[in-house]
């Protein structure tokens, strides 16, 4: 099964060695792209509405010719949900998340709502702080 890494905005304090996992696709979600660069990982695509990405990070993304998908701030889905939607045949992939820690409560509820109500929950792992949270369908 192919492995997908999604890096969310918000804090990211995981010490998981991501270099030990072979990812076929790496997605930076808005400001979560910084967590990838901090770990010397280059995303294949960055998507979001630019509400949590600073100018220097955006310039770095552009200078590296990384595919960038820009969304309007006013939209019906969160950037995280759009990143999940971008995955072709998600039920056939292992999806790993980093970031999304702490922050505003509504963001955490949104993450939990998405991963427990969609087909992504079949094979989703969230490296949350020092924990590994597995989401699997029964």
Regions of interest found by a model, annotated:
Residues 1-60:
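N-terminal beta-strand-loop-alpha-helix module at the start
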Residues 64-72, 123-125:
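A glycine-rich helix N-cap at a beta->alpha junction
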Residues 68-90:
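Short phosphate-binding loop-to-helix
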Residues 69, 95-100:
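Short glycine-rich or small-residue beta-strand-to-loop segments that form or flank ligand, phosphate
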Residues 106-116:
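Short Gly/Thr/Asp-enriched flexible loops that form oxyanion-binding sites at enzyme active sites
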Residues 117-122:
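Basic phosphate/pyrophosphate-binding loop/patch that engages nucleotide-derived ligands
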Residues 131, 136-138:
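Long, charged alpha-helical interface segments
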């Amino acid at each position: 099964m192919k492995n997908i890494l999604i890096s969310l905005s918000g804090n990211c304090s995981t010490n998981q060695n991501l270099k030990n996992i072979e990812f076929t696709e790496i997605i930076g979600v808005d400001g979560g792209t910084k967590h990838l660069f901090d770990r010397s990982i280059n995303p294949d695509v960055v998507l979001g509405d630019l509400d949590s990405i600073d100018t220097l990070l955006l310039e770095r993304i552009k200078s590296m010719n990384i595919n960038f998908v820009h969304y309007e701030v006013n939209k019906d889905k969160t950037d995280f949900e759009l990143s999940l939607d971008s995955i072709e045949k998600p039920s056939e992939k292992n999806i790993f998340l980093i970031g999304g820690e702490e922050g505003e409560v509504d963001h955490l509820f949104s993450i939990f709502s998405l991963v427990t109500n969609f087909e992504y929950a079949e094979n989703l792992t969230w490296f949350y702080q020092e924990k590994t949270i597995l989401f699997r369908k029964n």
